[in-house]
């Protein structure tokens, strides 16, 4: 039953909903202006309101979590301490709200990551000129953020599905937002069609899980109930077969959402055709939310079916399925990136390959020791944080290059260091982090992920992943060669607007600091 004391626990989600409606409302009130100057002011107003609002929601979520500051019990009572005390009353812990939404440490950390990614995306969009209704563009970003926050805390099958749809529908619209651009229109249509198929597959898997529970114990959609029934061996005979089939359909449906091979066909075209800041948002926040929901679905709904990703007679379960998907994803993602000449398409295949690395963190659930399982989850979260910062920076730099040079092919990077050295250096840090070069965050993220895979028994997969990491150096170094060695195709300087400059700086500082001082974030992740 919902109680008033649950409201503080949902405060970030409530604020996101209010912010989305506020952005829409403010845009409607300003629609009386039809001149180009009035249209420009509407864009600036919607963009600024979104960025400031997301920044405030991020501060609220950070204070609520207690990770930055925990109010002492002996603190004096005044106006400010009362605000912080009320905020932190909704901090990590407690039973799931009405049994369907968990506010544990995993939700808190993922919520901060998603809102932070949305904030950086809104900064990247400051110089985008949407169509006649800019408020809709920014409101869609906020609604998608709200859906992702609900995804990571979902503790029930129906809420998980609704949260996925609340995330997906705004992203379909954002991908195809520039209708006059054929590539954007194609991206939106393709994203919608593949997304609809994946949603159908996922919903069918969830219905099979409910059917298995209905056949065995009278029905259940709550993760905790399904976990309890699974562990006591309630799913036997036909119920066990239904549950296995449900697991396969759920993995396939989530595989589409996460662009895991062989469900990745939509990803390169959608990444290439979408507005570049939206591509950054899809490849980071959306993927992070998807992987965390997949972790909850598999470890909380099918814990007894984990199996092992080894090459001996113990192999089986969903970890073996994920191991095969990780192998295909890492190999095909990296090999397909080698011949690419369009940088957005190259980074799309790079993102596919990185999804394979993240799957290695999930395999640690097969480890015999609980400590190793915990380390696997920490490695997965650390990887998602570093990957999100790095990809936001890389796509943000590419968005600026595309605006200034008129394209995002490899040729448009040529001589960038002579046209804007700070931009080239910021882009270089992101590329080197994606490649896993020390001492950047990408190196330690891959190291922890490889350790998690090794502890799970998938040593064969770790070896292949290391080899593919070396292969990836080729296409990443091609980008650096174009920026620093090849002659410029145009000598005109490339300017860096303040919004994109701020977003890139935030991302690069995060990659550097969390790489050189990983304990700053690992000490927080250990609470999960």
From Swiss-Prot:
Its EC number is 7.1.1.-. GO terms for cellular component: plasma membrane. Pfam families: Proton_antipo_M. It is found in: Cell membrane. It catalyses: a quinone + NADH + 5 H(+)(in) = a quinol + NAD(+) + 4 H(+)(out). The keyword Ligase does not apply. The keyword Kinase does not apply. It comes from the Bacteria. One of its GO terms (molecular function) is quinone binding. Keywords: Cell membrane, Membrane, NAD, Quinone, Translocase, Transmembrane, Transmembrane helix, Transport, Ubiquinone. One of its GO terms (biological process) is ATP synthesis coupled electron transport. It is a multi-pass membrane protein. The chain crosses the membrane at residues 10-30, 49-69, 106-126, 139-159, 192-212, 232-252, 275-295, 318-338, 346-366, 377-397, 424-444, 457-477, 502-522. Belongs to the complex I subunit 2 family. HAMAP family: NDH1_NuoN_1. NCBIfam families: NDH_I_N (TIGR01770). NDH-1 shuttles electrons from NADH, via FMN and iron-sulfur (Fe-S) centers, to quinones in the respiratory chain. The immediate electron acceptor for the enzyme in this species is believed to be ubiquinone. Couples the redox reaction to proton translocation (for every two electrons transferred, four hydrogen ions are translocated across the cytoplasmic membrane), and thus conserves the redox energy in a proton gradient. NDH-1 is composed of 14 different subunits. Subunits NuoA, H, J, K, L, M, N constitute the membrane sector of the complex. This is NADH-quinone oxidoreductase subunit N.
